[in-house]
Amino acid sequence: MKFDLTTAYTLSIPLLASSGTVLATTADTSSKSSTMTAIHTSTGYNNHSDSLWATFNNNVALTWDAPNNEFYLPVITWHNRYTYDKEKTDKYNERPWGFGYGKYRYDKDNDWHSLYAMAFMDSHNRLEPIIGYGFQKMWIPGDLDGFRLGVGFTLSVTARHDYYYVPIPLPLPLFSVEYDQLSFQGTYIPGTYNNGNVFFAWLRWQW
């Protein structure tokens, strides 16, 4: 059988055209699929962010409208001796005289929410204000009536003399040991050597 190059060339044109169409269609479909996946992912992320923001705003509004009050009495500022030179801790103030006031509520899960403001003497014996929102998951240990343990966080803003009282955002962990209306509540401020690494605590009275 004789093989005709002209015939082979003629037949190859529609085959190549057909293959090109299939490849183009496949590439186009893949591109559209990737685009739709990206759109759905972006939309899901945005919806989740919007949901978190809406929940936060709702919690702040409900706490602001709550009729319950709290009084705060700062009791200790302890500088972690494992992360400070002794010559520094010897000069630092660890009696944070001050006071604070807040509004609070317990939600349907018995979790604590608060909006608060506090002012106290910092490590250099200078006035330091702080305001913020606090949240704690609460746990009642066994049958110990009136006792509660809490772990959570605060989203706060503070200002210090050594930073010219420029507002500084300060998200921090929170914990508390509570009995009825009285609580011992505190936080730990992380840091580096000779900076931060401070345990700060206060008494809290609710009415």
Curated annotation (Swiss-Prot):
This is Lipid A acyltransferase PagP. Pfam families: PagP. Belongs to the lipid A palmitoyltransferase family. One of its GO terms (biological process) is lipid A biosynthetic process. It comes from Photorhabdus asymbiotica subsp. asymbiotica (strain ATCC 43949 / 3105-77). InterPro entries: LipidA_acyl_PagP, OMP/PagP_b-brl. The record marks K88 as: Role in lipopolysaccharide recognition. Homodimer. HAMAP family: PagP_transferase (MF_00837). The record marks Y193 as: Role in the phospholipid gating. GO terms for cellular component: cell outer membrane. Its EC number is 2.3.1.251. GO terms for molecular function: acyltransferase activity. Its main location: membrane. It is found in: Cell outer membrane. Keywords: Acyltransferase, Cell outer membrane, Membrane, Signal, Transferase. Gene3D superfamilies: 2.40.160.20. NCBIfam families: PRK11045.1. Transfers a fatty acid residue from the sn-1 position of a phospholipid to the N-linked hydroxyfatty acid chain on the proximal unit of lipid A or its precursors. It is an enzyme of class 2 (transferase). The active site is at H79, D122, S123. It catalyses: a lipid A + a 1,2-diacyl-sn-glycero-3-phosphocholine = a hepta-acyl lipid A + a 2-acyl-sn-glycero-3-phosphocholine; a lipid IVA + a 1,2-diacyl-sn-glycero-3-phosphocholine = a lipid IVB + a 2-acyl-sn-glycero-3-phosphocholine; a lipid IIA + a 1,2-diacyl-sn-glycero-3-phosphocholine = a lipid IIB + a 2-acyl-sn-glycero-3-phosphocholine. Residues 1-24 form the signal peptide.
